[in-house]
């Protein structure tokens, strides 16, 4: 069934609204994908904070005009699908890569992260990186560790002094009597 101009315009507008705030995308192609496989992929992408669509190449190119992922959607050939997010690109890449390992019918074409087009190899490398949350927690640990060590050292001086005084009291060295020489 051919799309009417009005229906094409509606699809372009809908996709354009979705892509407007997207900062990262992974474009792929597939052959003989079953409905259950497609459903599973959509679930994984949604769980990673993204959206997934099978797109007509020319409509996707028009819809992406003026967006950060425009460069990735220009000049596509063959069957194409796009997973996109405005959130963590690593989470999206991990979700897609995990699913692709189990489903050979799907292959990556390219990706785009913050306006930079990345190759299939770089998509795989992106999937192996730690996510934003993990990087932030490691960074906070590195920032907090020196202050924590300093506080421990400063507390140790007072604690050690208290231990010495306590030992002196227990042995009777501070009883007020002068020790004979």
UniProtKB/Swiss-Prot annotation:
Q: Might you name a Gene Ontology BP term for this protein?
A: translation
Keyword Oxidoreductase (UniProt): no
- What protein is this chain from? Large ribosomal subunit protein uL10
Superkingdom, taxonomy of origin: Bacteria
Self-association state and partner proteins as the record states: Part of the ribosomal stalk of the 50S ribosomal subunit. The N-terminus interacts with L11 and the large rRNA to form the base of the stalk. The C-terminus forms an elongated spine to which L12 dimers bind in a sequential fashion forming a multimeric L10(L12)X complex.
Q: Which InterPro entries match?
A: Ribosomal_uL10, Ribosomal_uL10-like_sf, Ribosomal_uL10_bac, Ribosomal_uL10_bac_type
The organism named in the record is: Acidobacterium capsulatum (strain ATCC 51196 / DSM 11244 / BCRC 80197 / JCM 7670 / NBRC 15755 / NCIMB 13165 / 161)
Q: Which UniProt keywords apply?
A: Ribonucleoprotein, Ribosomal protein, RNA-binding, rRNA-binding
Q: What does this protein do?
A: Forms part of the ribosomal stalk, playing a central role in the interaction of the ribosome with GTP-bound translation factors.
Give the transmembrane ranges: none
Describe the family membership recorded for this protein in Swiss-Prot or TrEMBL: Belongs to the universal ribosomal protein uL10 family.
> What's one Pfam family the UniProt record gives for this protein?
Ribosomal_L10
Which gene produces this protein? rplJ
An MF annotation (GO) of this entry: large ribosomal subunit rRNA binding
Question: Can you name a GO cellular component term?
Answer: ribonucleoprotein complex
């Amino acid at each position: 069934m051919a799309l009417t101009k009005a229906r094409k315009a509606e699809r372009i507008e809908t996709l354009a609204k979705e892509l407007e705030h997207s900062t990262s995308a992974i474009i792929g192609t597939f052959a003989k994908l079953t409905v259950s496989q497609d459903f599973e992929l959509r679930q994984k992408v949604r769980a990673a904070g993204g959206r997934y669509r099978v797109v007509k190449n020319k409509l996707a190119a028009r819809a992406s005009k003026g967006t950060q992922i425009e460069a990735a959607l220009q000049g596509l050939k063959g069957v194409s699908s796009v997973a996109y997010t405005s959130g963590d690109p690593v989470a999206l890449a991990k979700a897609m890569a995990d699913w692709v390992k189990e489903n050979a019918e799907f292959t990556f074409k390219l990706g785009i992260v913050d306006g930079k087009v990345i190759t299939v190899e770089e998509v795989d490398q992106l999937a192996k990186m730690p996510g934003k949350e993990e990087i932030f927690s490691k960074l906070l640990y590195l920032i907090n560790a020196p202050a924590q060590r300093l506080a421990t050292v400063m507390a140790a001086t007072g604690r050690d002094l208290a231990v010495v005084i306590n030992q002196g009291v227990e042995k009777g060295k501070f009883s007020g009597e002068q020790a004979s020489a």
